[in-house]
Swiss-Prot record:
<keyword id="KW-0697">Rotamase</keyword>
<dbReference type="InterPro" id="IPR015391">
    <property type="entry name" value="SurA_N"/>
</dbReference>
<dbReference type="GO" id="GO:0050821">
    <property type="term" value="P:protein stabilization"/>
</dbReference>
<dbReference type="GO" id="GO:0030288">
    <property type="term" value="C:outer membrane-bounded periplasmic space"/>
</dbReference>
<keyword id="KW-0732">Signal</keyword>
<dbReference type="InterPro" id="IPR050280">
    <property type="entry name" value="OMP_Chaperone_SurA"/>
</dbReference>
<dbReference type="GO" id="GO:0051082">
    <property type="term" value="F:unfolded protein binding"/>
</dbReference>
<dbReference type="Pfam" id="PF00639">
    <property type="entry name" value="Rotamase"/>
</dbReference>
<dbReference type="InterPro" id="IPR000297">
    <property type="entry name" value="PPIase_PpiC"/>
</dbReference>
<dbReference type="Pfam" id="PF13616">
    <property type="entry name" value="Rotamase_3"/>
</dbReference>
<dbReference type="GO" id="GO:0042277">
    <property type="term" value="F:peptide binding"/>
</dbReference>
<dbReference type="GO" id="GO:0003755">
    <property type="term" value="F:peptidyl-prolyl cis-trans isomerase activity"/>
</dbReference>
<keyword id="KW-0413">Isomerase</keyword>
<dbReference type="GO" id="GO:0061077">
    <property type="term" value="P:chaperone-mediated protein folding"/>
</dbReference>
<keyword id="KW-0143">Chaperone</keyword>
<dbReference type="Pfam" id="PF09312">
    <property type="entry name" value="SurA_N"/>
</dbReference>
<dbReference type="GO" id="GO:0043165">
    <property type="term" value="P:Gram-negative-bacterium-type cell outer membrane assembly"/>
</dbReference>
Length: 434
């Protein structure tokens, strides 16, 4: 939810350009708890909004309405910045520089080009940095406070994941069979009832195990009746909307209907589906290693040489990898298991370790590898493909639920903070505490 990462450079430039102009004695526009909103803040942001609206061809409300909206935005920023100070939240220079580099990249600029752009618009780089720092602070406060108010139950994730899994996209192809119980052009109620009763009976028979094709041949008025009602493959978006709506959440083997249309009652069977399941398969590795950590008692060269000697002994058959690991490995988590790391995604490992591991063949032992932990001797025991479709679907469902609840809760939280704060707007005769 780091919205500050997507700031438009022009907005920040315009918002601060006004500060560079000569100012008369600045006025306090509002008192916000222990802070203030200055008139120059409002004027600067007002100019920014107008300029950006003009550049994008958008309409803006009248100045009075716009000023009110801007003032409310600045009041909320002020409240959150004061909260950040009380909570001890700070933005390091390193994090700030990374954020600015990201903004430059998003605007297809180098940092040097950004600095030049800022200077051309009359804004110092230091002023720009502080504006971004404020954006990051308010975002951090909001994220911290709102996150703790969000509860997502496992049942919610399961339900949404199942719903998403059953959702059929317009590009999904379905293999359908169809039975049509016809109605005359202007049917009487008795005819409608009789046709509906027959359709319901057929559905019950099919669900009870009766052969769909045989019932289609015997009862359907559809042109494909003699083929057992088989319609073949087709995309959902190509079907009549009456069918598509009911098939939106269908799954393989499902009987859908009866569906009433102008010509009769329809019964559909989903024989098969393709293009709906996007299986997510990941590679997992089973590896083991021996770790030596350089220290005052063991240099890098000594650690490397010791592992080379160990590898030679293992390859010659004099000893096993597990035995050496138990004797010399300095990884307490795996040494007593003979260096076994178990099945895991290679992405969890240190990049240098991972890269060396993924170059190995099954059973192969690496040369000594240096990582941020020390020196490793690595053996790839085995690899496997694991279906992570269900896990990925649940992760996506969780993110969707979180984002939905965050958006709702953030608005509620901001309204609560605004109501709880002491705010006095100083606007001539309209000055009043809120």
């Amino acid at each position: 939810m780091k919205n500050w990462r997507t700031l438009i450079l022009g907005l920040v430039i315009c918002a601060n350009t006004a500060f560079a102009a000569p100012q008369e004695v600045d006025k306090v526009a509002a008192v916000v708890d222990n802070g203030v909103v200055l008139q120059s803040d409002i004027d600067g942001l007002l100019q920014s909004v107008k300029m950006n609206a003009q550049q994008s061809g958008q309409q803006v409300p009248d100045d009075s309405t716009l000023r009110h909206q801007i003032l409310e935005r600045l009041i909320m920023d002020n409240i959150q910045l004061q909260m950040a100070k009380k909570m001890g939240i700070t933005i390091t220079d390193q994090a700030l520089d990374k954020a600015i580099a990201d903004i430059a990249a998003q605007n297809r600029m180098t940092l040097a080009q950004m600095r030049s752009r800022l200077a051309a618009d009359g804004l110092s780089y230091d002023t720009y940095r502080e504006q971004i720092r404020k954006e990051m602070l308010t975002s951090e406060v909001r994220n911290n406070e709102v996150r703790r108010r969000i509860t997502i139950l496992p049942q919610e994730v399961e339900s949404l994941a199942k719903q998403m899994g059953n959702q059929v996209s317009g590009d999904t192809e379905l293999n359908l069979s169809h039975i049509l119980i016809p109605l005359p052009e202007n049917p009487t109620q008795q005819q409608v009832d009789q046709a509906e009763d027959l359709a319901n009976k057929l559905v019950a028979d099919i669900k009870g195990g009766a052969d769909f094709g045989k019932l289609a041949i015997a009862n359907s008025a559809d042109s494909q009746a003699l083929k057992g009602g088989q319609m073949g493959w087709g995309k959902l978006q190509e079907l009549p909307s009456l069918f598509a709506e009911r098939l939106q959440s269908a799954h393989k083997g499902e009987i859908v209907g009866p569906i009433r249309s102008g010509v009769g009652f329809h019964i559909l069977k989903v024989n098969d589906m393709r293009g709906a399941d996007q299986t997510i398969s990941v590679t997992e590795v089973n590896a083991r290693h021996i770790l030596l950590k350089p220290s005052p008692m063991m240099t890098d060269e000594q650690a490397r040489a010791k592992l080379e000697a160990a590898a030679a002994e293992i390859k010659s058959g004099k000893t096993s990898f597990a035995t050496i690991a138990k004797e010399i490995s300095q990884d307490p988590g795996s040494a007593m298991q003979g260096g076994e790391l178990g099945w895991a995604s290679p992405d969890i490992y240190d990049p240098a370790f991972r890269d060396a591991l993924m170059k190995l063949k099954k059973g192969e032992i690496s040369a000594p590898v240096h990582s941020s932990f020390g020196w490793h001797l690595i053996q790839l025991v085995d690899t496997r493909q694991v279906d992570k479709t269900d896990a990925a679907q649940k992760e996506r469902a969780y993110r969707m639920l979180f984002n939905r609840k965050f958006a709702e809760e953030a608005q509620t939280w901001m309204q609560e903070q605004r109501a709880a704060a002491y705010v006095k707007i100083l606007d001539g005769s309209n000055a009043q505490p809120q």
